[in-house]
Amino acid sequence: MGGLMKKNTLILGIESSCDETAASVVKNGNEIISSVVASQIESHKRFGGVVPEIASRHHVEQITLVIEEALKQANVTMDDLDGVAVTEGPGLVGALLIGVNAAKTLAFMHNLPLVGVHHIAGHIYANRFETEFKFPLLSLVVSGGHTELVLMKADNEFEIIGETRDDAAGEAYDKVARTLGLAYPGGVQIDKLAKDGEDTFHFPRAMMDEGSFDFSFSGLKSSFINTLHNLRQRGEEPNPNDMAASFQASVVDVLVSKTIRAAKQYDVKQLLLAGGVAANQGLRERLIQEVKLELPETELIIPPLALCGDNAAMIAAAGTVSFLQGKRSGFDMNANPGLLLEDI
């Protein structure tokens, strides 16, 4: 990428696909100058999940403040920027619209190029702040709405070689946490409890031995809920640490074994972890351990915790790659909640 750069490229990234309103200024696609995230977790906690209408209202309230703060922290004005990148999809349509409209307005007013970004491409490119990419590479993307194995042979070329057939891993975490009476977001709570528990319940590992790289978590979720229900029917209250550890062991086993198998089959130079569930300590530790054992020649890249959840620095990073490839979005760009990674 270095050869393409005549000068420093400064991109403003905007992210509003779910329950974080974020803006960031990034230099050359790999250096964060500022990153501001306004989280809505407290507002959604009492509902046990994200309420789209509440999310949209928060985005409306926060978007201008967040963008202004990102510019202020970076000590730049709109005139210093080379372009504006924004999450175009997938996500909640009402939430996406707020970011897209803000980006279109700013780009139009300041005569700047506009670049639409796929949210998952953003999660993958969050790893660009750690190191340059070496192709071919494989990304394990694990979040509330996505569980995918994505093969890349070049920048901005995505091939999904495995995906969930039902629930995403993060979704299963949240549902299981709710049945245990844990606060939202559930994944973090399960991870904490699992540290002090043992895999005593031996929940099923779905599609573990199949040739495909697809995932399935609905059977595990049902097994967990049924086990908990049956124990409570008998008047027993199971150890929540062991329940959490058993659930997490099942998820991590499947994710890691399929990822290692795919990395071997496609002979990748780098293996990336991406998405909100990339913050999960159990998953991080197990992946590090297995890569050392099974793929000593493969470089494992794990983003810092601050870049696992939704943020705008990752959108600016992915947007910079598209910008330098000459890709532009028109002012007719709209929020696209069903945007496919392979179509970008």
From Swiss-Prot:
It is an enzyme of class 2 (transferase). Substrate binds at residues 141-145, 174, 187, 191, 280. It comes from the Bacteria. Keywords: Acyltransferase, Cytoplasm, Iron, Metal-binding, Transferase, tRNA processing. InterPro entries: ATPase_NBD (IPR043129), Gcp-like_dom (IPR000905), KAE1/TsaD (IPR017861), Peptidase_M22_CS (IPR017860), TsaD (IPR022450). GO terms for cellular component: cytoplasm. Binds 1 Fe(2+) ion per subunit. Its cofactor is Fe(2+). Belongs to the KAE1 / TsaD family. Required for the formation of a threonylcarbamoyl group on adenosine at position 37 (t(6)A37) in tRNAs that read codons beginning with adenine. Is involved in the transfer of the threonylcarbamoyl moiety of threonylcarbamoyl-AMP (TC-AMP) to the N6 group of A37, together with TsaE and TsaB. TsaD likely plays a direct catalytic role in this reaction. This is tRNA N6-adenosine threonylcarbamoyltransferase.
